[in-house]
Design a protein with these regions (language model features):
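Conserved G1/Walker A P-loop phosphate-binding module
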Residues: 117-255
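Conserved nucleotide-binding/hydrolysis micro-motifs of P-loop NTPases
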Residues: 27-29, 61-64, 83-86, 229-232, ...
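Canonical P-loop GTPase G-domain recognition
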Residues: 73-126, 130-133, 284-285, 311-385, ...
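Long, well-ordered amphipathic alpha-helical subdomains in the mid-to-C-terminal portions
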Residues: 371-421
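Flexible beta-alpha connector loops of hexameric P-loop NTPases
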Residues: 30-34, 92-97, 136-137, 197-199, ...
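N-terminal accessory targeting/assembly segments
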Residues: 1-81, 85, 436
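Intrinsically disordered, low-complexity proline-rich regions
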Residues: 288, 293-295, 300-302, 307-309, ...
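Conserved Switch II/interswitch segment of TRAFAC-class P-loop GTPases
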Residues: 27-35, 57-64, 233-236, 251-273, ...
């Protein structure tokens, strides 16, 4: 419970609200009218009066009725966790795409709460006895919001199509995505691996837009690495749905780097939160069995799949335990972690940190990425008839061509080729030799 309230306090701080007190109540089930019991509401009124507070944040989602009744009973502004997160996203959105995604989520959250929001407007206008809008005005606003939601969904579908076309046009390099709980250090990891001067901030949801960089992983290999928006406990469904075009980068990636804040006391729960969201996206099947010893992937042999969700392609997942410089005993931590994640990488992006383990740290992660790139894009010599210009052009488009030599009516192309493409070439009768 304390950890949950700590995180809610962090969200409040990120949103610009100062926390002056906290309380909780254990209940078997929330009451339909106030969520809390009447006695707790009276206690909360006393705490608010004593502290002079004008805002109450709830860690749990409130129904429109509960929110309205609580505000009447407490005579202060009431926000649930979802509304706080939406507010943070609204202030952090920078790109046109992120702003559309946030606006869509906000409107879908607002629609069933429109009457309550009008009550706030009446208060702001300040007149005693000032009546709220009539039913005609409310219905007009509802129709306008529904139209706007429809427009935003169409625009975001266009964005998703555009992203998909972009990905199809850049399959020459292996693709990887940084995923993880918010503030785990994903952006810092991209900055450290790429060497670029990227914006990094030690705050929740510092990054909302995807950012992609080509990373040199050594041995002549490069990986196209994408930073994605962070996840959080009880991430609003509206946001998951609205940010689907952005999160699709993780779905489309051939490799996932799950960045974990090793110093956080609840890191295991944070891992579970991230994997649950990935299940919603179809990257994992529900069932939560063992992690695969070779890659940290879930055993997806049990559990139902979400309706309408395509069977996900199993991906290699590298578990990256970051912020190792904040651990009191990195050796003991690594020993514990490797019982469940045998190939885990322990890192720190802090410039002054030293990871006292061979193969660890950012450079250790780079070598792990190199091995993955070699598996995803093996070097192959492919013999293509000179007349098959279409296939030669496709190899240049979808592979990293290293050399091309024409001998006796055959073009021998040496390239780093997507592993699954090699099988298709062999099925077409094309001679393929893998370089070891």
């Amino acid at each position: 419970m304390d950890a949950h309230l700590d995180e809610l306090g962090q969200l409040a701080d990120t949103a610009g609200a100062g926390v002056v007190g906290r309380t909780y109540q254990r209940i078997e089930a929330p009451t339909p009218n106030l969520y809390l019991g009447q006695g707790k509401v009276e206690e909360l009124k006393g705490l608010l009066l004593k502290a002079g507070s004008t805002l109450v944040l709830f860690d749990e989602p409130l129904s429109p009725v509960q929110g309205t009744n609580l505000e009447r009973a407490l005579a202060v502004r009431v926000m649930d966790r979802t509304e706080v997160i939406l507010d943070i996203f609204a202030t952090r959105a920078r790109s046109a795409e992120a702003k559309m995604q946030v606006e869509l989520a906000q409107l879908e959250y607002l629609l069933p709460r429109l009457t309550r929001m009008w009550t706030h407007l009446s208060r702001i206008r300040g007149g005693i006895g000032l009546r709220g809008p009539g039913e005609t005005q409310l219905e007009t606003d509802r129709r306008a919001i529904r139209r706007k939601i429809s427009v935003l969904k169409k625009r975001l579908e266009d964005v998703a199509d555009h992203r998909a076309n972009q990905r199809r046009g850049r399959r020459d390099l292996p693709s990887a995505a940084l995923i993880g709980y918010t503030n785990a250090g994903k952006s810092s990891m991209l900055k450290a691996l790429s060497g670029d001067d990227l914006f990094v901030e030690d705050r929740l949801f510092a990054t909302l837009d995807t950012l992609t960089r080509e990373v040199d992983v050594g041995g002549g290999y490069r990986v196209r690495l994408t930073d994605t928006v962070g996840f959080i406990r009880k991430l609003p469904h509206h946001l998951v749905a609205s940010f689907r075009a952005t999160l699709e980068e993780a779905r489309a990636a051939e490799l996932l780097l799950h960045v974990i804040d090793a110093s956080h006391p609840a890191w295991e729960h944070q891992v579970e939160v991230v994997e649950n969201v990935l299940e919603e996206m179809g990257l994992y099947e529900p069932g939560g069995g063992k992690r695969d010893a070779g890659s940290g992937k879930r055993d997806a042999r049990s559990g139902k799949r979400d309706a309408g969700c395509e069977r996900p392609e199993r991906k290699r997942v590298i578990y990256v335990f970051n912020k190792a410089d904040l651990l009191p005993d990195p050796d003991a931590f690594l020993e514990h972690v490797r019982e469940h994640y045998p190939h885990a990488v322990l890192t720190s992006t802090h410039p002054a940190s030293r990871i006292p383990h061979p193969g660890m740290g950012v450079e250790g992660l780079r070598s792990v990425l190199r091995a993955s790139a070699q598996a995803l894009r093996p070097v192959a010599r492919i013999q293509v008839p000179v007349a098959d210009g279409k296939l030669i052009a496709a190899l240049h488009r979808d592979s990293e061509v290293m050399s091309e030599v024409q001998v006796d009516g055959v073009v021998e192309v040496t390239a780093r080729v997507e592993a699954r493409l090699l099988g298709k070439l062999r099925q077409q009768g094309i001679t393929v030799e893998i370089s070891v």
